[in-house]
């Protein structure tokens, strides 16, 4: 379970249950904790930070207004991302846009250390993004959820509303294609491309 020190060790699910009983502070903490990563996830769909922020806010508002008890065998984060995905797809249906991953990944980069290391890390991320963009949109999304968000297969299945075999196959194929693209470019530091 996900725990957090500032709320006396309560998990996200416990905080959400407190919110369902009327504790708005518990939900405010969940918003603060998940807003940035949720916005980054939505960016994989809409490629516009302002729109992603609006959809994230809309997702939280949906939860506030509806106060639904979801299936607590899944994490709160899975439930939240499922709502956000639905809202992002609704937006795309209206706008008929393409799904992108680049900005969401760059927003997750934590550059620490000296300037030379920062430059090398940024160069590697730019190379990774360029390689990921060669993948089909379906593969871009599973790579982002699995490697950059840390979701488990079961959670990805729930978020994308697809079967476990399809999810595993998509991740496997995406990794295989990434490895192929990296070898074709052969100018990357092999140690850095550990996800392949």
Question: Could you say what each language-model-derived stretch is?
Answer:
Residues 1-37, 133, 191-196:
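N-terminal module of bacterial RNA polymerase sigma factors
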Residues 3-4, 20-29, 39-58, 164, ...:
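Short, charged helix-capping/linker segments at alpha-helix termini
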Residues 8-9, 98-125, 152:
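Internal acidic/polar
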Residues 20-21, 47, 58-75, 95-96:
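Sigma70-family region 2
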Residues 40, 54-61, 74-86:
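Structural recognition of an alpha-helix C-terminal capping motif at a helix-to-coil junction
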Residues 68-71, 82-102, 121, 173:
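Arg/Lys-rich amphipathic alpha helix in sigma70-family domain 2
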Residues 89, 148, 154, 158-185:
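DNA-recognition helix of helix-turn-helix
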Residues 142-146:
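A short pre-motif secondary-structure segment
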């Amino acid at each position: 379970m996900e725990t957090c020190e500032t709320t006396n060790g309560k998990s996200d699910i416990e905080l959400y249950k407190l919110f369902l009983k009327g504790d708005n502070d518990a939900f405010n903490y969940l918003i603060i904790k998940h807003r940035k990563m949720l916005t980054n996830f939505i960016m994989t769909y809409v490629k516009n930070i302002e729109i992603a922020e609006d959809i994230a806010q809309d997702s939280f508002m949906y939860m506030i207004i509806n106060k639904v008890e979801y299936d607590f065998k899944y994490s709160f984060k899975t439930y939240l991302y499922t709502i956000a995905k639905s809202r992002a797809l609704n937006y795309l249906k209206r706008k008929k846009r393409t799904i992108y991953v680049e900005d969401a990944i760059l927003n997750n980069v934590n550059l620490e250390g000296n300037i030379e290391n920062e430059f090398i890390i940024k160069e590697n991320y730019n190379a990774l993004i360029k390689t990921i963009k060669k993948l089909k949109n379906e593969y871009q999304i599973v790579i982002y959820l699995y490697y950059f968000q840390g979701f488990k297969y079961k959670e990805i299945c729930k978020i994308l509303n697809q079967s476990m075999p399809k999810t595993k196959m998509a991740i496997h194929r995406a990794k295989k294609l990434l490895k192929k693209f990296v070898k074709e470019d052969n100018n990357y530091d092999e140690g850095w491309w550990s996800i392949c």
